[in-house]
Each structure stands twice: as C-alpha cells, then as structure tokens.
Amino acid sequence: MTTSGALFPSLVPGSRGSSNKYLVEFRAGKMSLKGTTVTPDKRKGLVYIQQTDDSLIHFCWKDRTSGNVEDDLIIFPDDCEFKRVPQCPSGRVYVLKFKAGSKRLFFWMQEPKTDQDEEHCRKVNEYLNNPPMPGALGASGSGGHELSALGGEGGLQSLLGNMSHSQLMQLIGPAGLGGLGGLGALTGPGLASLLGSGGPPASSSSSSSRSQSAAVTPSSTTSSTRATPAPSAPAAASATSPSPAPSSGDGASTAASPAQPIQLSDLQSILATMSVPAGPGGGQQVDLASVLTPEIMAPILANADVQERLLPYLPSGESLPQTAEEIQNTLTSPQFQQALGMFSAALASGQLGPLMCQFGLPAEAVEAANKGDVEAFAKAMQNSASPEQQEGDGKDKKDEEEDMSLD
C-alpha cells in the first residue's frame, strides 16, 4: 500500500455526477510480470476507484467470480500514472506505474467493446490525481458552477460584503465545506486561523493527514453481466513502457446566470468546484510551497516562542501529540505543502481581496490580495505584526548593537 503523496483534494472541477458508489469501474483482468514479459491472469476481474469516508482514494481490483478484493491501494495525487502499453499486440493492456520506485501493476481490458478504453484510462488518471471534494459526488443542483454564475464582476464582492463575520467563518472555517472543501481545503485549519484573526480551530474529527488508513474492503457485489462473449486474454507482451505521453482534459463548463438571489449555500457549492484561474499579473507569481521549504522553516521552527504560538493549531486527538516534533512533521508533510500551494494559487488569482477586507487586514494586504500579488501580501502581513512583537525585535536588535559597541 502506498502512503506517499498529497491528501488534500484538488480544486479542479470535473464531471462527478455518477450515482455509482465507485468513481470509475471497468472489467479488467490482472497480469503477472516475469522478467520483461507479462502474462494474463484469465480470471474475470473488476478495476474500480473508490473514495472512502476519510476522503482517501483507493485503487482496487477484485475477482468478479469470488467477489474477493485482492488489491486495495491508497493512492495520493502524483503517486502513479495509468496508461496503455503500446507493445501489446491486442492494444488493450494497461499499466499502473508508480513514479517512486519500480512498482508496476498490469491489467488487460475485459470489456466487450474497445470504444471506452481510453475514456476509462482518462478517468482513472483524473480521479487518482484530482480527487473530488468530499461530498461533491452527492451534491446536486449547483455542481459545475463557476464564479461567473454570481452575476457579473461585482457579484462575489457584493455577496461577501453583505455577510456577517459568523457567516464568513461558516464559509471558510474548518467545518464550513465538509472540513476539506472549498477554501477550507486551501488553509487546513481555516483561513481565519492562518491569518491570525481568531482563536485556534475547533478540534476536528478527521484523522491526521499523515496517518495511514487501513485497507478498506468493500462489500462484495455482483457486477452486471451482459449477454456478450467474453474477450479473449491477450498474448504475452513485453513490459517495457515508453515515456508517458502528456494527457489533456477539457475542464470547461458552461456558466449560467442565477435565476434567484444567491444564498450562502450556493457560494459554498461554487467554491467547492471552482477552478483557480491564473493570476491577473499584478506582481511576480510566487508559490508559497516552494518558498517555505523544510530547509528554510527548520531554524524558524526551532524558536521556542514560535513553537508555543503554533502548538494550539495542531490537529488534536488521542494519537496526535501536540509537541514541537509534531509541528515539524506537520509543516514538512506533503499534505501541508500541497495545501500551501493551493492557498498560494487562490491568493494569486486576485479573488481573495474581499475576504481579507472582511477580516480587518491592513489596506496594503487587501490591495495585494486584490492584485494577486503574493509577495506583496506576505510583506504587508509581516509589516502588520503585533506591536509587542515589533518591540521585541527592536529590543533584540538594540542589544546586539550595544554588544558590538562594547567590542
């Protein structure tokens, strides 16, 4: 079972309307690799991808005859790639290739028709690398909307401006959009706690993003059968895989003007499926995830005062100790790094200005957020540090100068 990669879902919208309990499923058999040759296992099988209640994505294979699930792998974004093996004579052999290490799993298609093979392959890669928002599959009515559905350029600003502070906290807090949805996914403990405007977030019932989930074996179900002859197993093929070809997906969706006043629930649904656009070019694009690296954060996290301020924001639970070591583990985890990258992208989009204004941030920070200038926003936040902190920094600098004069 693979446990590397990022846990937080992506903000890329997609077609998630299937009522099936599996995100995608298709009939396929396994293949065994010996040396450089793969040999088909002639059993009837089913490949499916499932998102469990803990939001983890499982790639599974089960025997359709016995109902036994033989492979149940937890996959994180960018862990692996599913692609066709062109060396196979039948052209219907696919490989799940892990980017870290040499692990590869081969499958041969057992669907009677070939016209959906590439579509199944595309969907597998989409769901493995862009998991849907928790609860997005069950949502109805407003899925697929974009911000343009708010009714013009000023729609979002107008809606946010008329919200109370409690409504904003409901929207972007840790419980606002299912714990991991919308803007809550961008910030982990919630945007308010990240910006320092408010107390520590409430304890979440979700497990730590670094915890390993046990393999989930779904109840055995009998897959639907068709009165068509079963496809024949492919001949043994070479397992040599070519370099991955770039895949492309059409994530465009049609926006429609709302027929009635927009409610808070509508905005929540929109944010849960919105795609973060490119920044308007107000400043140089900065990816916070590439700036706040473990090497840069290490000396900062070694400061006892910093540790004391961060401890209340750690995930709480019986198996989650709130220690300085846990701070280090949290901030250096792939999950936190991806969440930081998502927040950086949202900030660079220039759409978070109204939210920053609602939280009473300095005018410089709001202006930078409106422009999508991440670097200017960070500088504005640094300049707006509490007077006590600035006084302490000034005192330390003065002491250093006095020590130098004594030398």
Swiss-Prot record:
Disulfide bonds: none annotated. The keyword Calcium does not apply. InterPro entries: DEUBAD_dom, Rpn13/ADRM1, Rpn13/ADRM1_Pru, Rpn13/ADRM1_Pru_sf, RPN13_DEUBAD, RPN13_DEUBAD_sf. One of its GO terms (cellular component) is proteasome regulatory particle, lid subcomplex. Residues 362-407 are annotated as: Interaction with UCHL5. It comes from the Eukaryota. GO terms for molecular function: endopeptidase activator activity; proteasome binding. CDD domains: PH_Rpn13. Residues 2-132 are annotated as: Interaction with PSMD1. The keyword Transferase does not apply. The modification Phosphoserine is found at residues 15, 140, 211, 405. Residues 277-391 form the DEUBAD domain. Coiled coil: none annotated. GO terms for biological process: proteasome assembly. Residues 196-259, 378-407 are annotated as: Disordered. There is a cross-link at residue 34 (Glycyl lysine isopeptide (Lys-Gly) (interchain with G-Cter in ubiquitin)). The modification Phosphotyrosine is found at residue 127. Ubiquitinated by UBE3C in response to proteotoxic stress. Residues 18-131 form the Pru domain. The Pru (pleckstrin-like receptor for ubiquitin) domain mediates interactions with PSMD1 and ubiquitin. Preferential binding to the proximal subunit of 'Lys-48'-linked diubiquitin allows UCHL5 access to the distal subunit. Component of the 26S proteasome, a multiprotein complex involved in the ATP-dependent degradation of ubiquitinated proteins. This complex plays a key role in the maintenance of protein homeostasis by removing misfolded or damaged proteins, which could impair cellular functions, and by removing proteins whose functions are no longer required. Therefore, the proteasome participates in numerous cellular processes, including cell cycle progression, apoptosis, or DNA damage repair. Within the complex, functions as a proteasomal ubiquitin receptor. Belongs to the ADRM1 family. Component of the 19S proteasome regulatory particle complex. The 26S proteasome consists of a 20S core particle (CP) and two 19S regulatory subunits (RP). Interacts with the proteasomal scaffolding protein PSMD1. Interacts with deubiquitinase UCHL5; this interaction activates the auto-inhibited UCHL5 by deoligomerizing it. Interacts with UBQLN2 and ubiquitin. This is Proteasomal ubiquitin receptor ADRM1. It comes from Bos taurus.
